[in-house]
Curated annotation (Swiss-Prot):
Domain Radical SAM core: 47-269
Organism for this UniProt entry: Caulobacter sp. (strain K31)
Keywords assigned by UniProt, alphabetized: 2Fe-2S, 4Fe-4S, Biotin biosynthesis, Iron, Iron-sulfur, Metal-binding, S-adenosyl-L-methionine, Transferase
Listed name of the protein: Biotin synthase
Assembly description: Homodimer.
Cofactor(s) annotated in UniProt: [4Fe-4S] cluster; [2Fe-2S] cluster
Residues reported in the UniProt entry to bind [4Fe-4S] cluster: C62, C66, C69
Amino acid sequence: MTQINAQLAHEPRHDWTLPQVEALFDLPFMELMFQAATVHRAWFDPSELQLSQLLSVKTGGCAENCGYCSQSAHFKTGLKAEKLMDAEVVIAKAREARDGGAQRFCMGAAWRELKDRDLPKLAAMIGGVKALGLETCATLGMLTAEQAKQLKDAGLDYYNHNLDTGPEYYGDVVSTRTYQERLDTLAYVRDAGMSTCCGGIVGMGETRRDRASLLHQLATLPSHPDSLPVNALVPVAGTPLGDKVKREGEIDGLEFVRTVAVARIVCPKSMVRLSAGRDDMSRELQALCFMAGANSIFVGGKLLTTPLPNMDDDSKLFLDLNMRPMGSAKIVAPESVAAE
């Protein structure tokens, strides 16, 4: 418990070694859960969840070859490429999200990097969403330092740019963008004064050491991610990694919980978010993730191109777990529950 006591007594560490992170993964499951829950309670109210909603504002046709992604132009997944949405449409979707209880609205575009020509339309989206009282987040691929400053000036609060996996396995995931380019974009975001949203995907065929390496990278950044999404791969037919996982099997649920728990311990102040793959998780598995330190989720029925649980199911789960959203939003029982 020495490392955990240090986490409770001081600001988060940035000097984790990879062997130390691996040792956390190797703890007996119940001990790991206890340590993660202890850290979580030191920094957060364990009964609160942050609710975010993500909208794909530009879908498909991406030039990247990320082996998990349905939106890559390199693979035949049946997804039709679409143009960048108009700001008015995005703002209307954000209003619906706010009225549904979301506190943060994220906008995602399927392209390799942000083009300067799209900045005015994106700035209008950001300003309109912010005017609704929502936190704003965007995931728009690689940025230059100047673009990061312009997004900050437009009012963007958070920028998402995932590392996806550890550097050792990264070459098996994507070859059109280097690991260093991802780190550079995160540096531009930090330097511009925006908060970072950065995590990865598990269940892509990587080893436990690769998962530890990803979390080691995140825990040794100059500042820990403000939001740390943990995605479970949703296998998409026609993508290399999706087809591989369908052949070889998906990640074990308890191993996923271990990943969430270690993320909580090494990045104690981050909002650890259950992201893609939650629709395939049982209520019990989600509850274990919350106990392990996850305190943020995506809602809204869809995450870019993959499904999420519907709000009625989420509301019932939150009620049964005695959990509530952060802020002023309230979860109300769906009609089917209220009638029981």
